[in-house]
Amino acid sequence: MVTLLSVRPRRVTPTRVYRFYRGGLLIDRMRGQPGVDSEYPEDWVGSVTVASNPGRDEPLAGLSRLDDGSLLRDEIAADPEGWLGADAAGGSTGVLVKLLDPAERLPVHFHPDRSFAATNFGSAYGKTEAWIVVATRGEESEVWIGLREPVDSETYRGWIDDQDRASLLASLNRVPVRTGDVVYVPAGTPHAIGAGALIAELQEPTDFSIVCEWAGFPIRPEDSHLGIGWDAALSALDLRAHTPIRELPDAAREFFWADELAEPAGRFAVWIVLDGSGSVDGAPARTGDCFVVPAAAEQVEVSSGLRILRCLGPEPG
């Protein structure tokens, strides 16, 4: 049964998440605050996914709360049809949206696809993702994505075992990025994000990362392969040459989609106010505010002065 509370957009409060790296200043500044880099460099927006941080006992980490303090996860469980639509009732939102702002380069890592995740982690989702650059600390930042040339598994395994950080990074395509740029990251593609870019990341709703480079980072080697060992983990890595994809391709619709259409989509959506001030469905809204829009929402009044990033899960069917 669809309830009145699940037919209107709801504001979500910030959900800052602990990570092994520092950052987050640009998230604060986006919201008109002075800004500081800390061990909470990410804000998980409209999230029903629990964050995985080895050694930390935080069962609710990563879970978004609505403006009344309730967990979005619980609200969806109480009215799955209203929030997710009839086709997805009782299921998942299918997407995790983050704002992340590293103050340091992240290690080279990759994520499993759905098939690998199902076999090894019992998950219906892997971790294909996409980055939308919202702002940068300087004129531009940089990311590294995919192998420049094919590499055989023995060579790559040697780089990991030796923690040859120079080879791990040099093997990747370096891509300068500026505000407004988009990079699509298929599961299995090795990558790293550089310092100084505020990114809106859309991804499948998991926290699976296989980390090739832990030397110099507060990461234990035994946590790098998610407990399955490197022999198994390397089979999830795409060792082919990769041409960076600087847009959201049609293939992304299987996982998520993003646009700037400030209107209901007939399925669960996360809205991030990228710029402006005004109102969303009568509620005050300004740059940095975030909302979740239920599938049952039919019409939402949005001030013309607001620029909104609409983030969607996989297309139905």
What are these regions, as identified by a protein language model?
Residues 255-261:
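A surface-exposed beta-alpha-beta supersecondary segment
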Residues 97, 106, 123, 129-132, ...:
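His/acidic/aromatic-lined binding-pocket segments of jelly-roll/cupin-type domains
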Residues 172-184, 279-299:
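Short acidic-glycine-tyrosine-enriched beta hairpin
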Residues 160-168, 277:
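Short, structured beta-strand/loop micro-motifs enriched in basic residues and often containing a Trp
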Residues 151, 169-173, 182-184, 190-244:
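An exposed, glycine/acidic-rich loop-and-rim segment of catalytic or binding clefts
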Residues 1-151, 215-243:
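Transition-metal
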